[in-house]
Structure formats: structure tokens, C-alpha cells
């Protein structure tokens, strides 16, 4: 696979992932309010689950070509999940004196993202009889 093809594959996936993250943020504010940055939390959970599924498919060499691996794992899951947004939102909460809210935000993002990635791995192994 050429460098240009790799960049294009990642770019396509990243465009989709970032767009999804943007709209998840908008929709989460409409339905869940602004108590916590739910859009970042939801995006991180979904992206971590997708990454968990994809990593099994890549490691077990099932049906992902290099093009799709780059597009889905690096591009889509990488741009859907967002450590930078989690960091900035948490720093803003801390700066505003909302210490417990910041702690809840950090713990929820880390714990639920790890849980989602684990569920992605386990469910994919189960579905493909790899467990």
C-alpha cells in the first residue's frame, strides 16, 4: 500500500469519526444537558468499543485489509475518541472550581472506555469463536 493510499484511508476514516463525534456532542447536549461533557464520554465509549472489535479482527488476521484497518482503527476510532477534549474539558472544570465534576468526568471516561474496549474484544472473540 502506498503512502498516499494510507493517508487517504486514514483521512476518510478520520473525517467520518470526527463528524460523528461532532454530532454526538450536539445531540447529547439536546438530550442530556450540559451537566457533564456527555458527547465526549459517549464518543469515547463508542470509539473504544469499535477499537476493541477491530483489534481482534486485526490480531486474528480475519477479514480486514490494510486499507480498512487504517481507515477504521486509525482514522475512524482514532478521531471518534478524544483524549484532548477530555483533558481540556476537565481542566476547564478544575479551573472553575468544579473539582468533583472533573473527577467524575475523568473516572467515567477512563472506566467506561476501558470497559467498552474490553466488551468489544470479548464479544468479537465470542462471535468468531476465538475465546
Q: Language-model segments: which ranges?
A:
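Membrane-interface helix-loop junctions in multi-pass transporters/channels
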Residues: 1-131
Amino acid at each position: 500500500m502506498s503512502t498516499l493510499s494510507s493517508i487517504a484511508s486514514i483521512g476518510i476514516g478520520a473525517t467520518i469519526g470526527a463528524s460523528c463525534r461532532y454530532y454526538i456532542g450536539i445531540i447529547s447536549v439536546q438530550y442530556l444537558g450540559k451537566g457533564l461533557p456527555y458527547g465526549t464520554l459517549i464518543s469515547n465509549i463508542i470509539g473504544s468499543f469499535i477499537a476493541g472489535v477491530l483489534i481482534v479482527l486485526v490480531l486474528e488476521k480475519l477479514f480486514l485489509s490494510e486499507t480498512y484497518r487504517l481507515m477504521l482503527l486509525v482514522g475512524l476510532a482514532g478521531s471518534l475518541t478524544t483524549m484532548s477534549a477530555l483533558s481540556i474539558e476537565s481542566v476547564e472544570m478544575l479551573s472553575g472550581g468544579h473539582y468533583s465534576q472533573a473527577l467524575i468526568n475523568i473516572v467515567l471516561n477512563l472506566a467506561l472506555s476501558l470497559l467498552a474496549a474490553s466488551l468489544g474484544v470479548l464479544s468479537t472473540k465470542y462471535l468468531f469463536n476465538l475465546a
